[in-house]
């Protein structure tokens, strides 16, 4: 399925050693969806052109392979309130100030605007963790087919982002989703069960999962 019929990205296999595939262009919702459908994602710093990446290797998390440590097991017993798609703009704004990739803010105002539009279109979703009335953790990403493409997560109290990821995995497993794309390998996510695969394998898995219809709309859980 072509999400942006006016533009097609280069073959991901032609990216450089760091995974950089293309530079520039406009960050529109349709173009972002087209990128994800080809195993590509935007990642760039404020003031710079849009950079489009397709790294090799790739990090994914199979929903039923999430690992729960002893400390996280204790945290999961706390009376958090778990919600989906009730505070998307707050979650992405928190992530913009609590970026996990670098110490710099990479979630630009342009990205916030585009992903908020994707949320309104039913493609971008947020998972929220509440301690009473306080938003203490969460994550957001894109859903296509039976795949969830994680973008960023945040926490204001210890392990709240891990609670959000566990929540995501539980929902994805119940909906028979195939994998969560974690993009770049990190020890933090690998300790939680994520695994490294080749780009070739990732692209094959992606094309298989895109055979399923997109689960669009405002998500909710009981």
UniProtKB/Swiss-Prot annotation:
**UniProt-recorded name of the protein:** Leucyl/phenylalanyl-tRNA--protein transferase
- Organism lineage string: Bacteria, Pseudomonadati, Pseudomonadota, Gammaproteobacteria, Legionellales
- Class of this enzyme: transferase
UniProt-listed Pfam families: Leu_Phe_trans
Q: What is this enzyme's catalytic activity, as reactions?
A: N-terminal L-lysyl-[protein] + L-leucyl-tRNA(Leu) = N-terminal L-leucyl-L-lysyl-[protein] + tRNA(Leu) + H(+); N-terminal L-arginyl-[protein] + L-leucyl-tRNA(Leu) = N-terminal L-leucyl-L-arginyl-[protein] + tRNA(Leu) + H(+); L-phenylalanyl-tRNA(Phe) + an N-terminal L-alpha-aminoacyl-[protein] = an N-terminal L-phenylalanyl-L-alpha-aminoacyl-[protein] + tRNA(Phe)
Give the main localization category. Answer: cytoplasm
Q: Which InterPro entries match?
A: Acyl_CoA_acyltransferase, Leu/Phe-tRNA_Trfase, Leu/Phe-tRNA_Trfase_C, Leu/Phe-tRNA_Trfase_N
* EC number, UniProt record: 2.3.2.6
Q: Name one GO biological process term.
A: protein catabolic process
NCBIfam families of this UniProt entry? aat
Q: Which UniProt keywords apply?
A: Acyltransferase, Cytoplasm, Transferase
Q: Is DNA repair given among the entry's keywords?
A: no
- GO cellular component labels: cytoplasm
Reported function: Functions in the N-end rule pathway of protein degradation where it conjugates Leu, Phe and, less efficiently, Met from aminoacyl-tRNAs to the N-termini of proteins containing an N-terminal arginine or lysine.
Where is the protein localized? Cytoplasm
Give the record's family classification: Belongs to the L/F-transferase family.
Top-level taxon of origin: Bacteria
Q: Which GO terms describe its molecular function?
A: leucyl-tRNA--protein transferase activity
Q: Does the keyword Nucleus apply?
A: no
């Amino acid at each position: 399925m072509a999400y942006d019929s006016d533009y097609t990205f280069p073959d991901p296999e032609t990216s450089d050693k760091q995974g950089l595939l293309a530079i520039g262009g406009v960050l529109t919702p349709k173009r972002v969806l087209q990128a994800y459908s080809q195993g590509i994602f935007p990642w760039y710093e404020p003031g710079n052109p849009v950079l489009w990446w397709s790294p090799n290797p790739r990090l994914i998390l199979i929903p039923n392979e999430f690992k729960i440590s002893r400390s996280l097991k204790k945290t999961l017993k706390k009376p958090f309130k778990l919600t989906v798609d009730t505070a998307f703009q707050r979650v992405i704004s928190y992530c913009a100030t609590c970026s996990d990739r670098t110490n710099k803010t990479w979630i630009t105002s342009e990205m916030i605007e585009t992903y908020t539009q994707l949320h309104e279109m039913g493609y971008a979703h947020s998972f929220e963790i509440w301690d009473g009335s306080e938003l203490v953790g969460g994550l957001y990403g894109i859903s296509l087919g039976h795949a969830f493409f994680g973008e960023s997560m945040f926490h204001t109290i210890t392990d709240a982002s891990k609670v959000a990821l566990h929540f995501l995995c539980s929902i994805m497993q119940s909906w028979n989703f195939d994998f969560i794309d974690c993009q770049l390998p990190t020890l933090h996510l690998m300790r939680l069960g994520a695994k490294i695969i080749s780009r070739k394998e990732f692209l094959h898995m992606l094309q298989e999962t895109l055979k399923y219809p997109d689960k669009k709309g405002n998500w909710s859980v009981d």
